[in-house]
């Protein structure tokens, strides 16, 4: 990960090249000393397809792909499609009624700046 020192008062976007595509990412405050470039893939079909293609070249042998709800959904969906896989697992942010005996685990998210629980259906664990 590259560390870039910025003046957030005057620097509102960070240009980044991802999978050969240039994008302007908004600079977002996490706390008083940490700012991140907010990468949101929703709605950017070209970026989703190209990013998935590059990630598929690097993904190790696996049983199933998994992502956390919600920003990873389009990416893992496209990766599964490109890899010819018919299934992937989604870790939900809250237990759902259809989840019989959900399994929960805590993760640290930098975009929400706090710990959060994720939930899997027991049969997916």
Specify the residue positions occupied by each region the protein language model found.
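Active-site-facing substrate-recognition patch
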Residues: 1-61
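A generic local structural motif
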Residues: 52-54, 75-76, 116-122
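Short, well-ordered coil loops that connect the C-terminus of an alpha-helix to the N-terminus
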Residues: 61, 85-86
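Short glycine-rich phosphate-binding loop at a beta-alpha junction
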Residues: 62-69
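Short, hydrophobic/aromatic-rich beta-strand segments within well-structured domains
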Residues: 66, 77-78, 89
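Gly/Ser/Thr-rich loops at beta-strand to alpha-helix junctions
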Residues: 69-75
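Short Gly/Thr/Asp-enriched flexible loops that form oxyanion-binding sites at enzyme active sites
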Residues: 75-84
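Short, glycine/charge-rich flexible loops or terminal/linker lids adjacent to PRPP-binding catalytic cores
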Residues: 86-125
């Amino acid at each position: 990960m590259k560390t870039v020192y910025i003046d957030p008062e005057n620097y509102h976007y960070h240009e980044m090249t991802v999978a050969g595509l240039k994008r302007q990412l908004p600079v977002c405050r996490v706390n008083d000393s940490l700012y991140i470039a907010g990468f949101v893939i929703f709605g950017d079909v070209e970026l989703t397809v190209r990013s998935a293609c590059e990630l598929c070249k690097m993904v190790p042998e696996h049983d199933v792909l998994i992502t956390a709800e919600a920003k990873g959904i389009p990416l893992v969906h496209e990766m599964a499609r490109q890899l010819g896989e018919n299934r992937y697992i989604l870790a939900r942010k809250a237990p759902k009624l259809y989840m019989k005996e959900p399994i929960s685990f805590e993760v640290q998210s930098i975009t929400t700046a706090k710990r959060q629980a994720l939930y899997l259906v027991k049969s997916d664990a």
